[in-house]
Amino acid sequence: MAGKTLYGKLWDIHEVARRDDGSSLIYIDRHILHEVTSPQAFEGLRLAGRPLWRVNANIATPDHNVPTTKAERQGSLLSIADTVSRLQVQTLDENCDDFGIFEFKMNDVRQGIVHVIGPEQGATLPGMTVVCGDSHTSTHGAFGALAHGIGTSEVEHVLATQCLVTQKMKNMQVRVEGTLPWGVTAKDIVLALIGKIGTAGGNGYAVEFSGSTIRALSMEGRMTICNMAIEAGARVGMVAVDEKTIQYVHGRPFAPKGSDWDAAVAFWRGLVSDPDAHFDRVVELSAEEIKPQVTWGTSPEMVSAVDQSVPDPERETDPVKKESLIRALKYMGLQPNDPITSIKLDRVFIGSCTNSRIEDLRAAAEVVKGRKVASTVKQAMVVPGSGLVKAQAEVEGLDKIFIEAGFEWREPGCSMCLAMNPDKLGSGEHCASTSNRNFEGRQGIGGRTHLVSPAMAAAAAVAGHFVDVREMMR
């Protein structure tokens, strides 16, 4: 019998029943909730008179709508200026109180972005199935977990039954070998991958990231890569368990203790793909060939190395792709063959569930230390992914480095990743962003988003336009 992939092992462990239509009922170990996709689910439970199936499998925190300025975070929820945002955060509080769900409320130091606090608290563990009403739940796959986003109706289903009806996916292996050049990061790996296979390349697959480069990454770097598996079209991204995984989880609040820990570790060490496991598709990347990446268009696949130029649609033979390029360049206000380094920035955003962990902030601070944000940049902001990340950064003095350079130092939340809170782009403004999506209007109506790593965003803030961070730090 052929060996199993990591995805196959986790699927088999959690499959409760197989249905006549080919779908399966799988058990869910961890459910994470936030204020945007949960209200209708809770209301559905009330109307049906259903209790939660397993209360302690759920945790919650507000992140999408919370303001990130101190003025709106110092008081009660009444300090939230936007009435819709205030209502959503208040509703989450009330629902969690009513149903007994553990919530990291807005002014709890442990509050933060769902995909930051889950791993940070040890609520995400190897071997788990993890779901959340958010597409970037794939982040948690970095721990050898089977994690993906779900819709609001599925949120209700998980709350009521602790199970989910879903289809088994095919297996893809993305193998990255070699040593990353200095200044090239996990964000650059995943952007280069998306540039290679496109935003539909992973459709129908669970992607396992492997190879010497992936093994050399920190857990933060692995989370960045798994976070953007969805931008490559895959619902699931994952990395096999190793000693880094186990060391990261050890001692965290929700992690097993004592003899339970020993038993868990013994099980976790088997959460790797077997040597003879079959993958339906294999994609290979060489780390040495990857350069700092910058998106120039309105899809994550519209990406180039920083030393390249914006493509010319006239060289595209596919009429559909050509039209897409023309539209993207028009929206972004760019011309064919513009050097990437000629793109000037209005704003810089360092944050989001992709790049707001302590490692990300350290990388950005290293670049801006002793430098100043360019006078042409209207706003540069750093938004830590959680209150604990913020506190750690302040212990290390990173906040002072950013503030002295001219950055705004904010409270944790999703912030400018998406236009659902006060942090937004104005129409026509270009932003170097460490987030994960650059669709039209993603950061504000008419806003122009360029996805980059934290180090590249920091370098762009100082220069006022895109530069190769490797040259700046040489």
UniProtKB/Swiss-Prot annotation:
One of its GO terms (molecular function) is metal ion binding. The keyword Coiled coil does not apply. Pathway: Amino-acid biosynthesis; L-leucine biosynthesis; L-leucine from 3-methyl-2-oxobutanoate: step 2/4. It is an enzyme of class 4 (lyase). Its EC number is 4.2.1.33. Keywords: 4Fe-4S, Amino-acid biosynthesis, Branched-chain amino acid biosynthesis, Iron, Iron-sulfur, Leucine biosynthesis, Lyase, Metal-binding. It catalyses: (2R,3S)-3-isopropylmalate = (2S)-2-isopropylmalate. InterPro entries: 3-IsopropMal_deHydase_lsu (IPR004430), Acnase/IPM_dHydase_lsu_aba_1/3 (IPR015931), Acoase/IPM_deHydtase_lsu_aba (IPR001030), Aconitase_4Fe-4S_BS (IPR018136), Aconitase_4Fe-4S_dom (IPR036008), IPM_dehydratase_rel_enz (IPR050067), IPMI_cat (IPR033941). Its cofactor is [4Fe-4S] cluster. Binds 1 [4Fe-4S] cluster per subunit. SUPFAM superfamilies: Aconitase iron-sulfur domain (SSF53732). This is 3-isopropylmalate dehydratase large subunit. The lineage of its organism: Bacteria, Pseudomonadati, Pseudomonadota, Gammaproteobacteria, Lysobacterales.
